[in-house]
């Protein structure tokens, strides 16, 4: 979980802003949830929370359920949102997001 990494109030606000389908924008989300202001170490901790199968990468299926890391009741991303998110983060084109790619993606926000 993100306990001790992000505040509950920031998480609630970030999730509330993207409840509608096709409204998720990763830059806005990372900024609202407070992640883009964090140190590289904290951003790496967040990566390990999202990388549920501990493969060292965030794959498409993990991206689809990205919001559920922040609240179990959150919606899944749509296919279009997932694809946009993946394209934004996957700078080497291998179809998944590594830890350095994730850090770059968060810092762009």
Curated annotation (Swiss-Prot):
Additional notes on this entry: Three parvalbumin isotypes, in nearly equal proportion, are found in toadfish white trunk muscle whereas only one main component (IIIF) is present in the swimbladder muscle of adult specimens.
Family according to the record: Belongs to the parvalbumin family.
InterPro entries, alphabetized: EF-hand-dom_pair (IPR011992), EF_Hand_1_Ca_BS (IPR018247), EF_hand_dom (IPR002048), Parvalbumin (IPR008080)
The name this protein goes by in its record: Parvalbumin beta
SMART domains in alphabetical order: EFh (SM00054)
Positions annotated to bind Ca(2+) 1: 51, 53, 55, 57, 59, 62
Source organism superkingdom: Eukaryota
Modified residues (N-acetylserine): 1
Domain EF-hand positions: 38-73, 77-109
Binding residue positions for Ca(2+) 2: 90, 92, 94, 96, 101
GO CC, alphabetical: cytoplasm
Keywords of this entry: Acetylation, Calcium, Metal-binding, Muscle protein, Repeat
Role this protein plays: In muscle, parvalbumin is thought to be involved in relaxation after contraction. It binds two calcium ions.
Pfam entry (one): EF-hand_7
Single GO term (MF): calcium ion binding
């Amino acid at each position: 979980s993100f306990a001790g990494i992000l505040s509950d109030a920031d998480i609630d606000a970030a999730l509330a802003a993207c409840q509608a389908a096709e409204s998720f924008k990763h830059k806005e989300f990372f900024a609202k949830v407070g992640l883009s202001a964090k140190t590289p170490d904290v951003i790496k901790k967040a990566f390990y929370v999202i990388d549920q199968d501990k493969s060292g990468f965030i794959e498409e299926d993990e991206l689809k359920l990205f919001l559920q890391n922040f609240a179990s009741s959150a919606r899944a991303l749509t296919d279009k949102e997932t694809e946009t998110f993946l394209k934004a983060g996957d700078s080497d084109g291998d179809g998944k997001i590594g830890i350095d790619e994730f850090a770059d993606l968060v810092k762009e926000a």
